[in-house]
Curated annotation (Swiss-Prot):
PANTHER family linked: WD40 REPEAT FAMILY
Entry keyword annotation includes Lipoprotein: no
Subcellular location: Nucleus
Protein name per UniProt: Histone-binding protein MSI1
Entry keyword annotation includes Chloroplast: no
Primary localisation category: nucleus
PROSITE patterns found in the cross-reference section: WD_REPEATS_1, WD_REPEATS_2, WD_REPEATS_REGION
Keywords on record: Chaperone, Chromatin regulator, DNA damage, DNA recombination, DNA repair, DNA replication, Nucleus, Repeat, Transcription, Transcription regulation, WD repeat
Gene symbol of the encoding locus: MSI1
Oligomer status and interactors: Component of the chromatin assembly factor 1 (CAF-1) complex, composed of FSM (FAS1), FAS2 and MSI1.
WD repeats: 127-167, 180-220, 229-269, 275-315, 319-359, 376-416
Organism of provenance: Oryza sativa subsp. japonica
Any GO MF annotation of the entry: histone binding
């Protein structure tokens, strides 16, 4: 029998992996009624590398759902045009007839309500040069959206000034073009304290800071300040959520850096730690605890650091089987953190369960702090976003064009111990 060529072996491996992924997906789909209170699966025309819920929520009179918007992008091929996109999402109200035991096979959703179609609608497309690496809205005015592009420039759009359907000439007309970088990247963060202050990290090892309220010339704006300290790609940047002068950055040099704009030498970080044994891809400051920051790395771990003693990590989460690309804290629950990796899984962690006692059977499923694994995606998850209005609802996008909006079942995060009791004798 002739020996298989390397190409044939690779093809066989890919086929086996695809079959395995499909089997895993079928098992996941069968179990969704027990694991989720809500799942909406929507196939986008093109994959989105970015997703973020907008902060506004409306309840149309006489309807059984609320309406929210989210920001998406496209990553097209074959010279197809790219867009920054706004989607409108219908989510069931708590008292709507939503039965998670009913999984609609045709529309791949549970917790369905009303008509099965039209839960997710693209309501605006804005022409964009190349794919949208990341898009984030400005907290003080959610009409303003910054995008990381495939060029060195960062774009700023006011989507209220753009038509819902893009001009057919394909021309991209951002309201501002921000200059300072020499190459593309992903890191992007708006200050919640100073309106218009935007941080960006890129592959050129630089961090740029702009004030978009400053006077621009011909719709272009130079950086207010450039920080160069990382040795290699700056993968992510984030403003601190309690202290207006502090921000953090992580990069391929394995380092987590903390910067203070009040520092006499503001071109140097005030703290620096080799956070991981591989490239650090993402960071997130805890919105409730001013000292806690989470990082995710190519070394497949998520780590927690305390800014008061940053030299050693507080805790390491190491259940991911692939590189970790994104971390994000729940906006409603101080101890809840999510992370996603190259391996198609999004994990939700509960810090309050660290070091809890486990039965041997439970220990086989992972450490006590691993609260939930979302297994609904069949390819790499590019980004996810916690819903700021609906507790425990997450949107996630993957490379196979799929957008999922989901909420784990309440009994997963509410232990029997957590249920309030009216019996004073049973109260702790």
């Amino acid at each position: 029998m002739p020996k298989a060529t390397a190409a044939e072996e690779e093809e066989f491996r890919a086929e086996v992996e695809e079959r395995l992924i499909n089997e895993e997906y079928k098992i996941w789909k069968k179990n969704t009624p027990f694991l989720y209170d809500l799942v909406i699966t929507h196939a986008l025309e093109w994959p989105s590398l970015t997703v973020q819920w907008l902060p506004d929520r409306a309840e149309p009179a006489g309807k059984d759902h609320s309406v929210q918007k989210m920001v998406l992008g496209t990553h097209t091929s074959d010279n197809e045009p790219n867009y920054l996109m706004l989607a409108q999402v219908q989510l069931p109200l708590d008292d709507a007839e939503a039965d998670a035991r009913h999984y609609d096979d045709d529309h791949a959703e549970i917790g369905g309500f009303g008509a099965a179609s039209g839960k997710v609608q693209i309501v605006q497309q804005i022409n964009h040069d190349g794919e949208v690496n990341r898009a984030r809205y400005m907290p003080q005015n959610s009409f303003i959206i910054a995008t990381k592009t495939v060029s060195a420039e960062v774009y700023v759009f006011d989507y209220s000034k753009h038509p819902s359907k893009p001009p057919l000439d394909g021309a991209c007309n951002p309201d501002l073009r921000l200059k300072g970088h020499n190459s593309e990247g992903y890191g992007l963060s708006w200050s919640i304290f100073k309106e218009g202050h935007l941080l960006s990290g890129s592959d050129d090892a630089q961090i740029c800071l702009w004030d978009i309220k400053a006077n621009s010339k011909n719709k272009t704006l130079d950086a207010l300040q450039i920080f160069k300290y990382h040795d290699g790609v700056v993968e992510d940047v984030a403003w601190h959520l309690r202290h207006e002068y502090l921000f953090g950055s992580v990069g391929d040099d394995h380092n987590l850096l903390i910067w203070d704009l009040r520092s006499p030498v503001s071109t140097k970080p005030v703290q620096s730690v080799a956070a991981h044994q591989g490239e650090v891809n993402c960071l997130a400051f805890n919105p409730f605890n001013e000292w806690v920051v989470a990082t995710g790395s190519t070394d497949k771990t998520v780590k927690l650091f305390d800014l008061r003693k940053i030299d050693t990590s507080l805790h390491t989460f190491d259940c991911h089987k692939e590189e970790v690309f994104q971390v994000g804290w729940s906006p409603k629950n101080e101890t809840i953190l999510a992370s996603c990796c190259l391996g198609r899984r999004l994990m939700v962690w509960d810090l309050s369960r660290i070091d809890q006692e486990q039965t041997p059977e439970d220990a086989e499923d992972g450490p006590p702090e691993l609260l939930f694994i979302h297994g609904g995606h069949t390819s790499k998850i590019s980004d996810f976003s916690w819903n700021p209005c609906e507790d425990w609802v997450i949107a996630s996008v993957a490379e196979d064009n799929i957008l999922q909006i989901w909420q784990m079942a309440e009994n997963i995060y509410h232990d029997e111990d957590d249920v309030p009791t009216d019996d004073p004798a049973k109260a702790p």
